[in-house]
Amino acid sequence: MVKRGRFALCLAVLLGACSFSSIPNGTYRATYQDFDENGWKDFLEVTFDGGKMVQVVYDYQHKEGRFKSQDADYHRVMYASSGIGPEKAFRELADALLEKGNPEMVDVVTGATVSSQSFRRLGRALLQSARRGEKEAIISR
């Protein structure tokens, strides 16, 4: 039984890694249609080249234009309450997606649960739209 489980896991990983071959080279983006109640809108950008993910960027942009990963005040508040800042949390999520190739396999970052869940949701939307050849996915909250 354990061998079957390992085989299924290996097969899923291999199939997941190969599934990007149908996605044309380029950068794809997923974001929300509206800003949240605090004026932030998160986005995910993934660049594919040769059937592989080569770059992942995840962040939030405020309606005034600033980015959460670079907002010192937000960093101070988030770090004080959760022990991690947005720049580190977002980098961990992006690196995990590059490594695993599947947003569903990206673990929740401790202290950034809401962002982790949103990251997965944006990741699913981005991959679905990219497979249809669409460069941008805009989803509702």
UniProtKB/Swiss-Prot annotation:
Subcellular location per the Swiss-Prot or TrEMBL entry: Cell membrane
Covalently attached lipid (S-diacylglycerol cysteine), positions: C18
Keyword hit for Cytoplasm: no
GO molecular function terms noted in the UniProt entry: FMN binding
UniProtKB keywords: Cell membrane, Lipoprotein, Membrane, Palmitate, Signal
Xref: Pfam families: FMN_bind (PF04205)
Segment forming the signal sequence: 1-17
Topology class, membrane: Lipid-anchor
Covalent lipid sites (N-palmitoyl cysteine): C18
Keyword Membrane: yes
Protein name, as recorded: 15 kDa lipoprotein
Organism: Treponema pallidum (strain Nichols)
